[in-house]
């Protein structure tokens, strides 16, 4: 049950990260606070994505709390790294997120996936 909550948390956090990325590419820079606040007031797709991303992180925290009640921290923490994989892949596949493929990034993703699999391998008796 803990793994399920962990995977739900990772999926929601990944969607939240993608939403925030979408919003930040379209809203005015935070370096210009008045323009940024004005952009928030426009309540367009970017503003909606910003608030959806923030809400997603909040929901993800509740799922993560459920995860930590039922799964060892060493295993739960390994699940978090799957978010990097999901965001990397989604940023390349979804239009407008400007993700770029590189062999270096692919090697990093493969290392993350191998590490998670090693942690979740059944222990030898």
Curated annotation (Swiss-Prot):
Pathway: Bacterial outer membrane biogenesis; lipopolysaccharide biosynthesis. PANTHER family: 4-AMINO-4-DEOXY-L-ARABINOSE-PHOSPHOUNDECAPRENOL FLIPPASE SUBUNIT ARNF-RELATED, SMR FAMILY PROTON-DEPENDENT DRUG EFFLUX TRANSPORTER SUGE. Coiled coil: none annotated. GO terms for cellular component: plasma membrane. Residues 24-33, 98-100 are periplasmic. The chain crosses the membrane at residues 3-23, 34-54, 77-97, 101-121. Residues 1-2, 55-76, 122-125 are cytoplasmic. It comes from the Bacteria. It is found in: Cell inner membrane. Heterodimer of ArnE and ArnF. It comes from Salmonella typhimurium (strain LT2 / SGSC1412 / ATCC 700720). Keywords: Cell inner membrane, Cell membrane, Lipid A biosynthesis, Lipid biosynthesis, Lipid metabolism, Lipopolysaccharide biosynthesis, Membrane, Transmembrane, Transmembrane helix, Transport. Its main location: membrane. The keyword Protein biosynthesis does not apply. Translocates 4-amino-4-deoxy-L-arabinose-phosphoundecaprenol (alpha-L-Ara4N-phosphoundecaprenol) from the cytoplasmic to the periplasmic side of the inner membrane. This is Probable 4-amino-4-deoxy-L-arabinose-phosphoundecaprenol flippase subunit ArnF. Belongs to the ArnF family. It is a multi-pass membrane protein. GO terms for biological process: lipid A biosynthetic process; lipopolysaccharide biosynthetic process; transmembrane transport.
